[in-house]
Structures are given as structure tokens and as C-alpha cells.
Curated annotation (Swiss-Prot):
Keyword Nucleotide-binding attributed: yes
GO biological process, one term: lysyl-tRNA aminoacylation
Keywords (A to Z) from UniProt: Aminoacyl-tRNA synthetase, ATP-binding, Cytoplasm, Ligase, Magnesium, Metal-binding, Nucleotide-binding, Protein biosynthesis
Family annotation (InterPro entries): Aa-tRNA-synt_II, aa-tRNA-synth_II, aa-tRNA-synth_II/BPL/LPL, Lys-tRNA-ligase_II, Lys-tRNA-ligase_II_bac/euk, Lys-tRNA-ligase_II_N, Lys-tRNA-synth_II_C, NA-bd_OB-fold
GO molecular function annotations of the record: ATP binding; catalytic activity, acting on a protein; lysine-tRNA ligase activity; magnesium ion binding; transferase activity; tRNA binding
Organism in which the protein naturally occurs: Shouchella clausii (strain KSM-K16)
Gene name of the encoded protein: lysS
Protein name: Lysine--tRNA ligase
Length: 502
């Protein structure tokens, strides 16, 4: 019954707004106006005139022109106040019939919350000191035919915030700020890398063989070529081909697609930056990683100290570095530096309550120990390096202990934020790694790598020693905006169809 009542109320509200729309047409007013030239945004008016006293503003003769969405309206008789909202925030406007004329004031009185308006007038301060604009011209620029969510309660339904992001952006200053911050983060990242001599490139999003990561791909079909294609699960292998071709420092910021679960940390479509630098190794990439992230925080937030949930995180270099085996040994006492068989490693896992499959090798067990005991404890920025060979098919072997690789992952607030390594540039070894991955696929791991003959052929022409890095942009934005869910920092996250329910 309540839903039916709300439905009827909404129907009535929509009908009233349609009637107002028709009335505007009847009066010869275009409810969906054309180009409108502004002189200021709301924050620019406040910044330019806030330092003046009420009396000083009364003596000035400045004229400003603004446009935005009507968010509040009050008053009666021949004068009223309202707030309009634009990209800079909100500002109060004061509309008097004797200042704008009877026709324009009649338009003002008929306006609904949500309507787009343009105003011109003189900046002034009210008795309580609020920066405002005394309007002398007013036009409607876009009629809102649907009421906005209640201004005091906003969008309580989290799913509605994600489905109708435009409403979230209208009603939530915090959400607007988060997405503006996201844009600035990417701008600063680009500028940082450009200044270090990196070349931004674009590589295919549809691959004939999915590769560069352990993940399930989305599959599509090319009608003209009559072939199956895969949405990319990583950017890596094409960028390495460019290193082979002599482009020594390259990066790409782009979308990546993984046919996996949805959670507060995962969205099937997400944004990464991957970069590769010839003649560098993973130690160089560590320095680059902490440098770029600290620089972004300082430039965008003004500080390298950020708050994430209950944690205060310091991003100023240098960050902690720990070998994966040493971290496990310190926490559990288990020493994976010791030589042991796959079976002995699995036995240790069972002894310590770490779930493992009978097909898991030594390297997989080491990684399971790390994820089980260590990962979520790494709050401050920490480079964990020395990943097992079995889980790092594209990384160079460590020369001192070839069971491990010259690879690191960056963890902050218990989450992986970056993955990097000294790239494997030996085509013979790379083929063996892919063959080992094929065995894992046969054993049921559908995320294992496939054989990529074209990539191996590229390596056979010779690739210089190279350091590579991947950073998840969305998780970095989460960290720097104190956002609990990845869907809070992706404008239009993946959702179920409405008819499927939530």
C-alpha cells in the first residue's frame, strides 16, 4: 500500500511539473535554453568577493553571471532567496520583483527544485554575512521534470547511488569531490611520468589470446573475421612488445576487464596504469612507485599523510621492504628458505590451518601462507618482494634462489595497490613458464596463462632488461579519497539488471 501511495504521489508530482512545462511554452519561454555565457562559478564569486565587508560590497558595482541547478527556494510576496549549485559548489541568490521585473519574477516563483537557471546580478552579503548575488536577470536553462531526492536524506539506497550516479553527484558534495579528485590523480600521474621521459601509448583492448595476468577473460566474437576475441585482462604483453621495438620508456592508462566477482575491492571493469622502463630492474621500479604515489598525494591533497578508515597512513618515502619468506617466518615461524618438496610444503599448510589443494606446489603454498597470515596486517606502505616462481610466470628468476623471483607487490591498508617485477626477457625460459601454466590449466586452474607464441617470438628478437609496474587506479583513488568501496570511485560500476533484483 505504501509503495502504491508513493507511486501516486510521484505521478502527481510529475504531472505538476509537466503542467509547468506546458505553461512556459504557452508564455513563449523556451524551457530548455541554449548557450549561456557565465563570468564566474559559485566558488569564484565567493573567492573574489568574500574578503570585502558588507558595506564595501554595497559601494562596488561588480556584475557577475552564473548558471546552475536550483537546490533551495524560499520566500513569499515580491522577494525570495534560493541556492544554485554548479561545479564550484553552491551560492545564494536574492530575487526581487522590482529588480528583475514582473515577468522574470513570475518565472522565479514557478521554478522547481532541480531546474537549471542562469542569473546575473551584483555580489553582496546578507545581514548574517552569507555571500550572495542580488539578481537583476534570470532565465531558465533546463526544466527538471522529476523531483530530486529529499535534500535532507539524499540517496539512502546505496544501489541507487551507483545506478543513478547523476543523482548522487547532484546531491552529494562528497561524491563530487571524490570524482574530481580521481581526475586530478590521473592528471598528476601523467604529468609525473611525462616529465620523466615516459611515452604514453595505446594498445589493443581486444586480444586473440588473453595474457599478462592470472584471470578469467570476457569473450566476444568478431563477425567479419569470424574469430573469438578476449577483452584484455592486462596491458602488459603489448607494452613489452614496444620495449622490444625500441620504445624504452612507455606507459598506458586504460581499462582492463576480468570476468570475476564483484566486491568492495573488485569491479569487472577497472582502470590500471602499466609502465615499462628498459635497462631498469625491480629496485628502480620500487623507487619510481613510492615517488609517484607520494607526489600524487602531495600535489592533489597537499600532504603525504592520509586517513583511510581508522588508519593514518604515511606515504612519504622510503617505504618498508620485506621478503615474502621473511614476513611469513617472522609471523608464523615457518621457514620457507629451507629446501622442501611440494608435499612437505602442503603438510606445513595443513599443520597451520592454511587451506591448500593437493595440486599446489611449493610456490603456491608460500603464497597461500602470505595471504592467510600477512596481507591484511600490512597497513603502512610495504613492498613485499621475492614472490615464488610458480605464481610469477612473467618475472625474472632470482639469481641467488631461483625458486623465487625479482618481483614485488605494494600493500597499503591490507590491500594490494601495485605489482611489479624485473621482466623475464629470456624467450626460452618464458616458453617453459607458459608450458608450466598449461599444466596448471589442465589441472583445473582456468586463470592460468595460455601459450602466447607471438609474444615469445617478439622476445626472440631480443628484449633489454626491463622493469615493469602495474598500479590499480581505482584502489589508489579509494585510498586518497577515504572511500570504503571501489564502486564509490567508479562513476558507473557494474550492476545487475534491475529485473534480476539485487
Amino acid at each position: 500500500m505504501r509503495a502504491m501511495t508513493e507511486g501516486l504521489e510521484m505521478h502527481d508530482l510529475l504531472a505538476v511539473r509537466r503542467d509547468k512545462l506546458n505553461q512556459l511554452y504557452d508564455e513563449g519561454i523556451n524551457p530548455f535554453g541554449g548557450k549561456f555565457e557565465r563570468t564566474h562559478t559559485s566558488n569564484e564569486v565567493i573567492e573574489q568577493f568574500a574578503a570585502f565587508t558588507k558595506e564595501e560590497l554595497e559601494e562596488k558595482d561588480d556584475h557577475v553571471v552564473l548558471a546552475g541547478r536550483l537546490m533551495t527556494k524560499r520566500g513569499k510576496g515580491k522577494a525570495g532567496f534560493a541556492h544554485i549549485q554548479d561545479i564550484g559548489g553552491q551560492i545564494q541568490i536574492y530575487v526581487r520583483q522590482d529588480a528583475v521585473g514582473e515577468e522574470a519574477y513570475g518565472l522565479f516563483k514557478s521554478l522547481d527544485i532541480g531546474d537549471m537557471v542562469g542569473v546575473g546580478g551584483r555580489p553582496f552579503k546578507t545581514k548574517v554575512g552569507e555571500m550572495s548575488v542580488k539578481v537583476t536577470e534570470l532565465v531558465i536553462l533546463g526544466k527538471s521534470l522529476r523531483p530530486l531526492p529529499d535534500k535532507y536524506h539524499g540517496l539512502k539506497d546505496v544501489e541507487q547511488r551507483y545506478r543513478q550516479r547523476y543523482l548522487d553527484l547532484i546531491t552529494s558534495p562528497e561524491s563530487r569531490t571524490a570524482f574530481i579528485t580521481r581526475s586530478k590523480i590521473i592528471q598528476v600521474m601523467r604529468r609525473y611520468l611525462d616529465e620523466k621521459g615516459f611515452l604514453e601509448v595505446e594498445t589493443p583492448m581486444m586480444h586473440s589470446i588473453p595474457g599478462g595476468a592470472s584471470a578469467r577473460p570476457f569473450v566476444t566474437h568478431h563477425n567479419t573475421l569470424d574469430m573469438e576475441l578476449y577483452m584484455r585482462i592486462a596491458i602488459e604483453l603489448h607494452l613489452k612488445r614496444l620495449i622490444v621495438g625500441g620504445l624504452e620508456k612507455v606507459y598506458e592508462i586504460g581499462r582492463v576487464f576480468r570476468n570475476e566477482g564483484i566486491s568492495t575491492r573488485h569491479n569487472p571493469e577497472f582502470t590500471m596504469i602499466e609502465l615499462y622502463e628498459a635497462y631498469a630492474d625491480y629496485h628502480d621500479i620500487m623507487e619510481l612507485t613510492e615517488g609517484v604515489i607520494a607526489h600524487i598525494a602531495k600535489e592533489v591533497l597537499g600532504t603525504t599523510t592520509v586517513q583511510y578508515g581508522e588508519h593514518t597512513v604515511e606515504l612519504a618515502p622510503s617505504w618498508k621492504r620485506v621478503h615474502m619468506v621473511d614476513a611469513i617466518k617472522e609471523k608464523t615461524g615457518v621457514d620457507f628458505w629451507q629446501q622442501m618438496s611440494d608435499g612437505e610444503a602442503r603438510a606445513l599448510a595443513k599443520e597451520h590451518g592454511v587451506p591448500v589443494k593437493e595440486t599446489m606446489t611449493f610456490g603456491h603454498v608460500v603464497n597461500e601462507f602470505f595471504e592467510h597470515f600477512i596481507e591484511e596486517t600490512l597497513i603502512q606502505p610495504t613492498f613485499v618482494y621475492g614472490h615464488p616462481l610458480a605464481i610469477s610466470p612473467l618475472a625474472k628468476k632470482n639469481e641467488e634462489d631461483p625458486r623465487f623471483t625479482d618481483r614485488f607487490e605494494l600493500f597499503i591498508v591490507g590491500r594490494e595497490h601495485a605489482n611489479a617485477f624485473s621482466e623475464l626477457n629470456d624467450p626460452i625460459d618464458q616458453r617453459k613458464r607458459f608450458e608450466a601454466q598449461l599444466i596448471e590449466r589442465e589441472q583445473g586452474d582456468d586463470e592460468a596463462h595460455r601459450m602466447d607464441e607471438d609474444f615469445i617470438e617478439a622476445l626472440e628478437y631480443g628484449m633489454p632488461p626491463t622493469g615493469g609496474l602495474g598500479i590499480g587506479i581505482d584502489r589508489l583513488v579509494m585510498l586518497l579519497t577515504n572511500s570504503p568501496s571501489i564502486r564509490d570511485v567508479i562513476l558507473f560500476p557494474q550492476m545487475r539488471n534491475r529485473e534480476q533484483g539485487e
